[in-house]
Amino acid sequence: MKRTHTCGELTLQNVDQKVILQGWVKKIRKLGAMVFIDLKDRYGITQLVIEQENINLINNLKNEYVIEISGIVVKRKSVNKELITGEIEVIVKDLLVINKSELTPFVLENDVNVNEDTRLTYRYLDLRRQVMQNNLIIRAKINHIIRNYLTDLNFLEVETPYFAKSTPEGARHFLVPSRLNKNKFYALPQSPQLFKQLLMISGIDRYYQIVRCFRDEDLRIDRQPEFTQLDLEMSFATSEDVMQISESLIKKILKEVKNFEIKEPLLRLSYKDAIDLYGSDKPDLRYELKIHTLNDIFKNSDIKMFLDSQNKYIRAVCIDQLLTKKQLEELNQQAKQFHFNSIAFIKVENNAWSGSLASQLTEVQKKQLIEEFNIQNKATIILNIGKYEEISQLMGAIRISLAKMFNLETKDDFKLLWVVDFPLFEFSEQENRYVAAHHPFTSPKEESLADFDTNKKDALACAYDLVMNGFEIGGGSQRITNSEIQQRMFDAVELNQKQVEANFGWFMNAYKYGAPYHAGIAWGLDRISMILTDSNSIRDVIAFPKNSLGIDMMSNAPDLVSDKQLDELNIKTVE
C-alpha cells in the first residue's frame, strides 16, 4: 500500500485519522502491557503504540527492520517537544515487515563512537543517521538557492566535458586511457576553466554550472579527489561585477540556510596584509589574535636567539590567557612541523613576568610589550624568529591552535572577506622557475601590466579569493583576453611556442575570432556545506566520499583490473 504520510508530518490536526506509514524501526520500548516503537524516515520520527491485543504483530521485530503500519492518530499524553510529531502517536492496527535487517555494525545514532573507515564501509547505514541526512538536505538547499538566484539573473546552466585534454599547469590530473585512440589519454578536468572561457567567446555571456572536478593531490579534511564547484563566468564584466554577485549570493545562502545576516560590501584584505596580520591567505576573522612584528622592540637586545636578526623577523601572537605547560608543549610540537626547534614564550600576570625569555627582558621592553599587545591583567606571548614567509606561516598556525585551545571559533558565526592583490607568480623550488600562482589565464593587475614578465617577484594578479571562517570557499580572476599579453604570460612561465601550441593551441585559436573581456569565480560547495553544517570534514557532506587515502571503503576502489581490460587499452602494469 502507499503511505499516506511521512514520519515527520503528523500533528494534532491529524487526530482520529487512519494513516499508513512506512519506514525503519529506530527503537523498541516495552512499558507494561504496551510496546512503543519509534518509526523513522528522512522526514522525522513518529511514535507507534502496540496495544496488548495486537502484541503478536511485533513478534521478532528488531531495530532497522523496514515496516509498514496502518493505524489511528491519537493525542499523546506526554508531549515530546524535540519531535515535530511530538504531540501525537499512532495506535497500530496492522503491521507488515517489508524487509528484515541484520544487526548493524554500529549504532545508528547522531553521536556514534566508531572509526571513520567503518562508517565509510557501511556508508548506506551511516547515511540513515539524522545528522548525516540533515547535511545532505542542507547541501541540496544550497544548490537550489544557487540555481534559482543565478537563473533569475539570466545565467545559463551549461554542462562542459568531463573527458578533456591534459595541460601542464596546476595539480596532477587523473588520466583516462582511450581504447579507440591507442596510447592516448583524456584528463579529468581540475576545473572547466578553458571551456567556460570558450563559452564567453561563444556568446554565452552569463554561464554557471554545479560541476564535479578532479585533482590527484594529497588529501586533507577539506579536500577530496573528486569535488563539486559552483563555476561561474561573466562576459563584459570585471572583477567587481563577479565579486558583487558572489557577495549577494552568499548573503542569500546564509540568510535562508542559517538565518544569518551579513553586511555588504565584505571586508577586503590584500594578500600581503593577510599574511602580515594573520599568517594566512585565508584568515579566520571570528577572533582577533593578530600577528605582531617585534624587531623594533628587540633590535638592541642581548637575548641570544635575537642576536642574529639580520634579514629575519621576530613575530609574535598574544592571547589574554595563561597557557599551561601541556599547552605550551603542544605549540612546541607544532613548531617542529614548521622546521623550528621550539617556540619562545613570555607570561605576564598582574605585572609578574615569567617564561623562557622573561628574565632577559628589560623594563623598557616589558613596557613596550604591554603597549604593543594592550595587555591588561594577564597574557601569554608566543614568539620566534625566522625568515618572513616561514615565521609568518608558523605564527598563523599557532594563532589557529590558540583559538581552538580557548574555544574562540564561535559556532553559527560567519566571518567573510575577500583576499585580493595576490602574487601573479610563485617560485617553484622543485622546478626552479616561476609558475602561475593561479593559472596562466589570470590577468595581471593594471599596475603590473608593463613589467609583469620581467618583474615576476612583485607582479600582482587581478585575482580574488572569498574566505569564510578560515576556509577559502571561492576563487576567481579577471581573464586575459589580449593575445599579446597572453603570449607574454606563456613566456613568463617558460612555455615555449611548441608547448603552447600542443597544449593550448585549440583554445588560443578561439581568440582570433573576437573575445569579450570576462571574469569569473569558482566556489567550493563541499567546503561551504561543511561550514554551514558545522561538520568536521567535507566527507560528512558528501554522500559517498573517499577516505583520507583516496579509497572508496565500500567498493574498494581503486582496484586491480583484468589483463583483458589492460590489453584493450594497450597498457601494461609494472610491479
Swiss-Prot record:
GO terms for molecular function: aspartate-tRNA ligase activity; ATP binding; nucleic acid binding. Its EC number is 6.1.1.12. It is found in: Cytoplasm. InterPro entries: Aa-tRNA-synt_II, aa-tRNA-synth_II, aa-tRNA-synth_II/BPL/LPL, Asp-tRNA-ligase_1, Asp-tRNA-ligase_1_N, Asp/Asn-tRNA-synth_IIb, AspRS_core, GAD-like_sf. L-aspartate binds at E169, R215, H438, R479. Transmembrane segments: none annotated. Keywords: Aminoacyl-tRNA synthetase, ATP-binding, Cytoplasm, Ligase, Nucleotide-binding, Protein biosynthesis. Residues 193-196 are annotated as: Aspartate. Gene3D superfamilies: Bira Bifunctional Protein, Domain 2 (3.30.930.10), GAD-like domain (3.30.1360.30), Nucleic acid-binding proteins (2.40.50.140). It comes from the Bacteria. GO terms for cellular component: cytoplasm. SUPFAM superfamilies: Class II aaRS and biotin synthetases, GAD domain-like, Nucleic acid-binding proteins. It catalyses: tRNA(Asp) + L-aspartate + ATP = L-aspartyl-tRNA(Asp) + AMP + diphosphate. ATP binds at R215, D216, E217, Q224, E472, G524, L525, D526, R527. The keyword Cytoplasm applies. The keyword ATP-binding applies. PANTHER family: ASPARTATE--TRNA LIGASE, MITOCHONDRIAL, ASPARTYL/LYSYL-TRNA SYNTHETASE. Homodimer. Belongs to the class-II aminoacyl-tRNA synthetase family. Type 1 subfamily. Catalyzes the attachment of L-aspartate to tRNA(Asp) in a two-step reaction: L-aspartate is first activated by ATP to form Asp-AMP and then transferred to the acceptor end of tRNA(Asp). This is Aspartate--tRNA ligase. It comes from Mycoplasma capricolum subsp. capricolum (strain California kid / ATCC 27343 / NCTC 10154). The gene is aspS.
